[in-house]
Amino acid sequence: MEFEAVIGLEVHVELLTETKIYCGCSTAFGSEPNKHVCPVCLGLPGSLPRLNKKVVEYAIKAGLALNCSINNKSRMDRKNYFYADCPKNYQITQQEIPICREGFIEIRNHLGEKKRIGIERIHMEEDAGKLIHTDEGTLIDYNRAGIPLIEIVSKPDIRTSKEAVSYLEDLRNILKFIGVSDCKMEQGSLRCDCNISIRPKHNLKLGVKTEIKNMNSFKALEKAIQYEYKRQSDLIESGEKVRQETRRWNDAKNVTEVMRSKEYANDYRYFPEGDLTAINISDNYIDNIRKTIPELPDKKIDRFVEEFKISRKEIEILILNMEIGDFFENAAKLSGDPKSVSNWITGDISRLAKETGIPLNNLNFTERDLAELIEFINCGVISNNIGKKVIEEMFYKGKSPRQIIHEKGFVQNSSKEKILKVVKEVMEENPKSIEDYKKGKKKAVKFMIGMVMKKTKGNANPMLVNKLVEEEIGKY
């Protein structure tokens, strides 16, 4: 029997606010344990929460970017459960009236075709503390307690592990692009739970779903779905039943493991949060937030592909964040050579950024500087190899290409007489290479060209060097 998976994702996203959702404690990551805490986020008796307005703004901004409707009236609810990392023994979240509902994003499948994935709801909530297990016992860091989250719940429109990864990647890109989260999975600011069931293909009846947790990377999400699909398929084909339960992905063993039987909403005894008033959002407030949303990644990609005639794959790398996309666009227009701009950004500039840890959106030079460098290369003032040396100086010292070329004496030598003199010297010094050429060894020509470039310290015009070497060696 052939089965298909029915998959929905619940994505928890930490918002880039300076303070927590219900108090004024800092949200700074990586501080010493329990430094950013107060009576409110520790759940001490008598402490009262106050909703952070920036959290509401960012939740609405995310909802609009994800094509959601925004509820003009919303409220917070208590979700009651007892666990060590939840100091109040309840979480302030949204159950009945979430801030956003009925949205969608469009992903691309393996054929490059668009597929719409529905978003059921987006709601605001607080994060829990962090448990740290040691040989002596379990410690609790409450710095994370009260960090503002939005939970984005997709509809069960996803059918494969590849689609799930594509959805999560697109979601991450949008949220980073609009500046509401840094979406760093390695720091836990983007976390994903997966609900998956299987059913016979072309059968509309849903199967019993399993929730999978502890997937800390896109690869883990893909592998967990593939494993769970096979596990459930094997159970059904052997006549056994799939149980509704929560499972944990074990990255070391590449398996899912049982955590607990699946809870239902009434297990949490939700009821309205009495310490916070209802949230009233005007249409004017929503419209003002809408105006702050930039051109989103998918539309920008389509426009760049059409306008600059370079591949979608290259463009996807160039717009990983808004600043890089804007840098590329401005440099492409200034230089009139978008392909070269793309090559420099995705090549040498990205390499230098990775080696130094300097982010691409914090470069020492401007779009005009890169356009000027490309113009010098295209006009033959310097070679592409010299351009690589210039870009390093630009990257580290922030000088303009013109200044670097002048200071270093990098101007390309295009004098036929001077280059021909070096070519003849190289041939006199390497008679064996000439003999190799006579025997049909084409590598001898490349060797000669390399030696000429070495002698001229890379300043010779490479096209002229090629031409003169081939002409001279052909005389032997």
Swiss-Prot record:
<dbReference type="GO" id="GO:0006412">
    <property type="term" value="P:translation"/>
</dbReference>
<dbReference type="GO" id="GO:0050567">
    <property type="term" value="F:glutaminyl-tRNA synthase (glutamine-hydrolyzing) activity"/>
</dbReference>
<keyword id="KW-0547">Nucleotide-binding</keyword>
<keyword id="KW-0648">Protein biosynthesis</keyword>
<dbReference type="GO" id="GO:0005524">
    <property type="term" value="F:ATP binding"/>
</dbReference>
<dbReference type="GO" id="GO:0050566">
    <property type="term" value="F:asparaginyl-tRNA synthase (glutamine-hydrolyzing) activity"/>
</dbReference>
<dbReference type="InterPro" id="IPR017958">
    <property type="entry name" value="Gln-tRNA_amidoTrfase_suB_CS"/>
</dbReference>
<dbReference type="Pfam" id="PF02934">
    <property type="entry name" value="GatB_N"/>
</dbReference>
<protein>
    <recommendedName>
        <fullName>Aspartyl/glutamyl-tRNA(Asn/Gln) amidotransferase subunit B</fullName>
        <ecNumber>6.3.5.-</ecNumber>
    </recommendedName>
</protein>
<keyword id="KW-0067">ATP-binding</keyword>
<comment type="subunit">
    <text>Heterotrimer of A, B and C subunits.</text>
</comment>
<keyword id="KW-0436">Ligase</keyword>
<dbReference type="Pfam" id="PF02637">
    <property type="entry name" value="GatB_Yqey"/>
</dbReference>
<dbReference type="InterPro" id="IPR017959">
    <property type="entry name" value="Asn/Gln-tRNA_amidoTrfase_suB/E"/>
</dbReference>
<dbReference type="InterPro" id="IPR042114">
    <property type="entry name" value="GatB_C_1"/>
</dbReference>
<dbReference type="InterPro" id="IPR004413">
    <property type="entry name" value="GatB"/>
</dbReference>
<dbReference type="GO" id="GO:0070681">
    <property type="term" value="P:glutaminyl-tRNAGln biosynthesis via transamidation"/>
</dbReference>
<comment type="similarity">
    <text>Belongs to the GatB/GatE family. GatB subfamily.</text>
</comment>
<comment type="function">
    <text>Allows the formation of correctly charged Asn-tRNA(Asn) or Gln-tRNA(Gln) through the transamidation of misacylated Asp-tRNA(Asn) or Glu-tRNA(Gln) in organisms which lack either or both of asparaginyl-tRNA or glutaminyl-tRNA synthetases. The reaction takes place in the presence of glutamine and ATP through an activated phospho-Asp-tRNA(Asn) or phospho-Glu-tRNA(Gln).</text>
</comment>
<dbReference type="InterPro" id="IPR018027">
    <property type="entry name" value="Asn/Gln_amidotransferase"/>
</dbReference>
<dbReference type="InterPro" id="IPR003789">
    <property type="entry name" value="Asn/Gln_tRNA_amidoTrase-B-like"/>
</dbReference>
<dbReference type="InterPro" id="IPR006075">
    <property type="entry name" value="Asn/Gln-tRNA_Trfase_suB/E_cat"/>
</dbReference>
<dbReference type="InterPro" id="IPR023168">
    <property type="entry name" value="GatB_Yqey_C_2"/>
</dbReference>
<dbReference type="InterPro" id="IPR014746">
    <property type="entry name" value="Gln_synth/guanido_kin_cat_dom"/>
</dbReference>
